[in-house]
Design a protein with these regions (language model features):
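Conserved catalytic core of the tyrosine transesterase superfamily
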Residues: 1-242
Length: 242
């Protein structure tokens, strides 16, 4: 009503509204709102009033407050160990050491660990996930201590897979003692850390996409973006200012 003044809606009115959105909202929010009104225009048959969404430039840097570092990850693991939460400690190391999704923890079974390889089925795709020797030893020792002789290693007291929410809550409880920004601490960030470390060694994005189970390399690119700090250091080292 603010833009139509109780008069007919014109293309100019919609463009004015789009400009208002650009000045007051983030790009993704603007595009979401534009998609809604475009759908309404299609429903009403007002196709000539539709407007284009804003182009969203691919993110180049990861905000520092969101990137979990290797040192912070190590502190989280040590804190979990000090709190005698060995299950959480090993969940962190398993996700970060293999690059699997939280939902794929169910494939980390005693049988898979003994074999050093888990066969993961996710999103209509099957892939093999290798389990390195050191992680294998830790997981088998934990399973033996818990009396788990077969099947899933990470389970609740009732034998069900641990939910993402439970892992998230337990991870957040480590933040203060581990001195890690809570904004960085969520399960999927461990997968991102795996991706950055792997790419830093191999520089093979296609191979990394296969390991992570991505259908598109564009998704993998999002995982390996670093903070602006690293980019700034590289530019400083170029020494092109005379």
């Amino acid at each position: 009503a603010k833009y139509t003044q109780n008069s007919a809606i014109t293309k100019e009115t919609v463009i004015t509204y789009k400009k208002y959105l650009q000045e007051n909202y983030a790009v993704r929010s603007v595009n979401s709102m534009l998609a809604s009104i475009n759908s309404l225009f299609v429903f009403l048959g007002w196709h000539d009033l539709k407007v284009k969404s804003l182009k969203l430039q691919q993110q180049v840097f990861c905000p520092e407050e969101k990137e979990l570092t290797k040192a912070e990850y190590a502190r989280l693991c040590r804190t979990a160990e000090r709190k005698h939460n060995e299950r959480l400690n090993l969940i962190l190391q398993t996700i970060c050491g293999t690059g699997i999704r939280v939902s794929e923890l169910q494939y980390i079974t005693v049988e898979a660990v003994k074999n050093g390889e888990a066969v993961v089925n996710c999103k209509a795709k099957t892939r093999s996930v290798f389990i390195v020797k050191e992680l294998k030893q830790k997981l088998l020792r934990y399973a033996a201590e818990q009396g788990i002789k077969s099947g899933m290693i990470f389970v609740t007291r009732t034998g069900k897979p641990i939910s993402r929410t439970n892992i998230w809550r337990e991870m957040k409880a480590l933040c203060e003692e581990a001195n890690v920004n809570p904004q960085k601490v969520f399960p999927h960030n461990l997968r991102h850390l795996f991706a950055r470390v792997f790419y830093g060694i191999e520089k093979d994005i296609a191979k990394l996409a296969d390991i992570l189970g991505h259908s598109s390399i564009n998704t993998t690119r999002i995982y390996i973006i670093s903070t602006g700090t690293g980019h700034r250091h590289r530019m400083e080292n170029m020494r092109l200012i005379i």
